[in-house]
Every structure is written in structure tokens, then in C-alpha cells.
């Protein structure tokens, strides 16, 4: 071991390029879908990071609609995080199998609160919680001129000539009924009992976002981060009850006893849930997490733009080598890895995928979008959004200290492994995703890869030095107009 102390040489994104290959593949024809686990299939290989300035429900909804996945961060209370997951799962459905409902004795105020919280425009009214016999419907139209919100729902709900359909009605059949009767919500009933709901909004969303990433019930996919802290047990339980599709056991060092034990426990308790564990940077760590029960392993120790782990702790593996080493081990288990961190351009995404990643996790590239929860600032006449690492002092004070195994320390004793900063405002997420995936598609065309599996298995790299990197970027010219997919 002593003799091999300096034997390892590692590479990162700026050290390599993909070699062009013979190709009859057009970028517009490539397949970007990827299966991360038995229950998680994405239509683009992109996941938004579980960071408190990157992903809450708004980002997760937008990511899933684009075909990717969002990880709700855990720097919030247990109930609040579960609510964020519920917002994603209820944002659109093919058929809502467990719709919200109220009873006629409840107040209009309660209805208004429910509709506002989940951004829904109406709710079915049933006789009681047990029998759930449909007796009316309450919509925004019924509430339009209400001034006294203390009155009972029974005083304002629509109860005559209710239009319903039987359980099993298809979306096409439902659309015809909704259009015929000029209504927006169609309750599904069986023997008078409310069993489901189809809305015109959900049908429109299916048409608007045909490649959305959804579960078997037609709901958008949602993931959430957990850690190894004292509240992890109840947090995981509440998230599963909220309908989460994947739990991300998110720590700075996944190759540790506490994380491995947590993976075993979570997978044994919730075998139906996809468990993602990390972060790691070696084949040995990847093997340990897969053997513990992880479905997917997340790779990256310190490559992120806001991470200082490598300079504070002196630890890490340059990301291309880390991804390749971990992917080599993952192949033996027939499982997937996620490349997390260090990605600055769309070209880095395809490099990470070609090195063995099934998907990439993005933070800085998405933090400036409209859907991120970071605060908007104006600096020197330009709009920015706040972006910080989960190892920064601010994030650790809000709850991410357990990620860095400092749960028992007071804020004054924290040793941060991240910084707080700002990133340029970019507008809607879909514009950024379009440019990023356009770059990936182009790279797949250059390498003759019609799908991501072929890219992983057959794409070849060449190493380059600093001169090669300088040659790769625009040079000997002054840029006069910003490009939507390049800034340096």
C-alpha cells in the first residue's frame, strides 16, 4: 500500500474529449431515455440537485414535465418536505385515484385553504368521510363572489345536474364528456361513491408535455433527500406516505458505516421505493452501497462549483475518473450510477454519460432558472439568483450539517465545505433543458450513439492538455453577443 500511495492518476471533464466516430445517427433521432431502477424511467438523463437553492416542488414539477427528475431538498421540516412531494404528485395526473374531497359541513374557508395550498380549482363534496357518496362539487366559479368564508360549503356548492363517469373511463372518453358539457372536472363514481377524478387541466398537460416522467398511475415522478440524522426515520415514513418515488440518502461521504446501515434499513423498510445512496468516488464504495441494498449510487466528492471539500478536507477524485471507476463496479451489479457535480457545459454532460453515468445531477446549471427557490437579486444591473452549497454555513445552519457529519456541533463550531454565491438568472427551466439536451444530442450524433446505452458502451475518449482545452474554447476573438449555451 505504501508503494502505491501516488499510483493513481485521475482526470476530469477538461482533461478529455470524446472521439468522433462513423455515424448515421441524426441528433433529432437519438433516444435520451434511461432506466435508473425498476420503477424509475426518465426521458432525459437529468436530475436536479437536492439543494435548498435548486429544488423544491416548483423545480421538481418542471423537471418531471421535461422528462427528468427533481430531488426535494431536506433543509425544511418533515411535514413541509412531505407537502412539497405531495404538490409534485398531485400537480397532474392521468386519473386522480385518490382525489381530495370535503364534506358539506366544512367551511368555505377550509375549501379555499385546500384549493390554494395545492393550486387546484375545485374539489368534490361527499356526504361523509366514510361512505364518500358524491353529493356536489365546489369550484372557483362557486366562490367568485363569496365574502363570508365562514359559511358552510353546502350553501354554495353545485349539487344539481352533476356530470360523472364510471371508474375505468379513458382520458379520450373523459375529454369528450368534458367538452360536451363544458366543464373542467369529471368525478369518477362507482355505486355513487367517489373513486377518482379527471380534470381538463391534466388532459391538457398530457398533450403539452408528452415526454413527462411519470409513475405507473400517471403522476409526475418525485424524489426527496434524506440523511442520517435523528429525524430520518419519521422523515422517510412521511415522504413515502406522500407518494415519493425515490429516496436519496444524501451525505458527503457515502462510504461510511452510518450511511451503509441507513441504506440497509431504508431498503428493508421500504423495498418498493427506489433508494439512491451517495456520495462516493471509488469502486469499493460503490460496491459497499450496492451490497447494502442501494438501487442507484451517486458519484461525486467535491467537484461542484460551490463545494470546497477538496480544498478544505484535501479529499476527492476528479470526476471523470470517479464516474468511470464507479460505473465499472456498477456494471457488475447491473445497476445505475448518477454523476453528481462539476458539470459546466452540455459537453460535460455527455462526457459524464459516456464515462459510465446513467444520468447527471445538476446544481449550478439549474440554480439560475425561474423555477429554483433561490432568491432573486439585482447586481450591477443584471438579475441573479442566490446559489449556495449544502456545505455552506447558511445551509448547514438550516439543517444540512448532518450531511457533513456535524449534527452534534453548534453553528459557531461548523467547519463548512461549501460557499454561498450568486448565478446569472436564466429564465424558464425548459429553455435551459432544451439547450443542454441539444448539446447532448449533438454529441451522440458525432459519436454514432443512437441511445445512451450505446454511448456508455462504445464511446471512446482522448486525453488533452491545457493547450487542447484552450483550443476547445473560443479564442483570439472578443465575444460580442452572448450565446444561450456558452459562458466562460
From Swiss-Prot:
Keyword line: CBS domain, GMP biosynthesis, Metal-binding, NAD, Oxidoreductase, Potassium, Purine biosynthesis, Repeat
Annotated GO biological process: GMP biosynthetic process; GTP biosynthetic process
Record entry for activity regulation: Mycophenolic acid (MPA) is a non-competitive inhibitor that prevents formation of the closed enzyme conformation by binding to the same site as the amobile flap. In contrast, mizoribine monophosphate (MZP) is a competitive inhibitor that induces the closed conformation. MPA is a potent inhibitor of mammalian IMPDHs but a poor inhibitor of the bacterial enzymes. MZP is a more potent inhibitor of bacterial IMPDH.
Keyword Oxidoreductase: yes
Top-rank lineage group of the source organism: Bacteria
Recorded catalytic activity of this chain's protein: IMP + NAD(+) + H2O = XMP + NADH + H(+)
One of the record's GO molecular function terms: IMP dehydrogenase activity
Active site as annotated: 307, 403
Region listing for Disordered, in residue ranges: 467-488
Classification via Pfam families: CBS, IMPDH
Domain CBS: 95-153, 157-216
Stated family: Belongs to the IMPDH/GMPR family.
Protein name per the record: Inosine-5'-monophosphate dehydrogenase
Species name: Staphylococcus epidermidis (strain ATCC 35984 / DSM 28319 / BCRC 17069 / CCUG 31568 / BM 3577 / RP62A)
Amino acid at each position: 500500500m505504501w508503494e502505491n500511495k501516488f499510483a493513481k492518476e485521475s482526470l476530469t471533464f477538461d482533461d478529455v474529449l470524446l472521439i468522433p466516430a462513423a455515424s448515421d445517427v441524426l441528433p433529432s433521432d437519438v433516444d435520451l431515455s434511461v432506466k435508473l431502477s425498476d420503477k424509475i424511467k426518465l426521458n432525459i438523463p437529468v436530475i436536479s440537485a437536492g439543494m435548498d437553492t435548486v429544488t423544491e416542488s416548483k423545480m421538481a414539477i418542471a423537471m418531471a414535465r421535461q422528462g427528468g427528475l427533481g430531488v426535494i431538498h431536506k433543509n425544511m421540516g418533515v411535514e413541509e418536505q412531505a407537502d412539497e412531494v405531495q404538490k409534485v404528485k398531485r400537480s397532474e395526473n392521468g386519473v386522480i385515484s385518490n382525489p381530495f374531497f370535503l364534506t358539506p359541513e366544512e367551511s368555505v374557508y377550509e375549501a379555499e385553504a385546500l384549493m390554494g395550498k395545492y393550486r387546484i380549482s375545485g374539489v368534490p363534496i361527499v356526504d361523509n368521510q366514510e361512505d364518500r357518496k358524491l353529493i356536489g362539487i365546489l369550484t372557483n366559479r362557486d366562490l367568485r363572489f363569496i365574502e363570508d368564508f365562514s359559511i358552510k360549503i353546502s350553501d354554495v356548492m353545485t349539487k344539481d345536474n352533476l356530470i360523472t363517469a364510471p371508474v375505468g373511463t379513458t382520458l379520450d372518453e373523459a375529454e369528450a364528456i368534458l367538452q360536451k358539457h363544458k366543464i373542467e372536472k369529471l368525478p369518477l363514481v362507482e355505486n355513487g361513491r367517489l373513486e377518482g377524478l379527471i380534470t381538463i387541466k391534466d388532459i391538457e398537460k398530457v398533450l403539452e408535455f408528452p415526454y413527462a416522467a411519470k409513475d405507473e398511475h400517471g403522476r409526475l415522478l418525485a424524489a426527496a433527500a434524506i440523511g442520517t440524522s435523528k429525524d430520518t426515520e419519521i422523515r422517510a415514513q412521511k415522504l413515502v406516505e406522500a407518494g415519493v418515488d425515490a429516496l436519496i440518502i444524501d451525505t458527503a461521504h457515502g462510504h461510511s458505516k452510518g450511511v451503509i446501515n441507513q441504506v440497509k434499513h431504508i431498503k428493508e423498510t421500504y423495498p418498493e421505493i427506489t433508494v439512491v445512496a451517495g456520495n462516493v468516488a471509488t469502486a469499493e464504495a460503490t460496491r459497499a452501497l450496492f451490497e447494502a441494498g442501494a438501487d442507484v449510487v451517486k458519484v461525486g466528492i467535491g467537484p461542484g462549483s460551490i463545494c470546497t471539500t477538496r480544498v478544505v478536507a484535501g479529499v476527492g477524485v476528479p470526476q471523470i475518473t470517479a464516474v468511470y471507476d464507479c460505473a465499472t463496479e456498477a456494471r457488475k451489479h447491473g445497476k445505475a450510477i448518477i454523476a453528481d457535480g462539476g458539470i459546466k457545459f452540455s459537453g460535460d454532460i455527455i462526457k459524464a454519460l459516456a464515462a459510465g453515468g446513467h444520468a447527471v445531477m445538476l446544481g449550478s446549471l439549474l440554480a439560475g432558472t425561474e423555477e429554483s427557490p433561490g432568491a432573486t437579486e439585482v447586481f450591477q444591473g443584471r438579475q441573479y439568483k442566490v446559489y449556495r452549497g449544502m456545505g455552506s454555513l447558511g445551509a448547514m445552519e438550516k439543517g444540512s450539517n448532518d450531511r457533513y457529519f456535524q449534527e452534534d456541533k453548534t453553528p459557531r463550531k461548523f467547519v463548512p465545505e461549501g460557499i454561498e454565491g450568486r448565478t446569472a438568472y436564466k429564465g424558464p427551466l425548459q429553455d435551459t433543458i432544451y439547450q443542454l439536451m441539444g448539446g447532448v444530442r449533438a454529441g451522440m450524433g458525432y459519436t454514432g450513439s443512437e441511445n445512451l446505452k450505446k454511448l456508455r458502451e462504445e464511446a471512446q475518449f482522448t486525453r488533452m492538455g491545457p493547450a487542447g482545452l484552450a483550443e476547445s474554447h473560443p479564442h483570439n476573438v472578443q465575444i460580442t453577443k452572448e450565446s444561450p449555451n456558452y459562458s466562460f
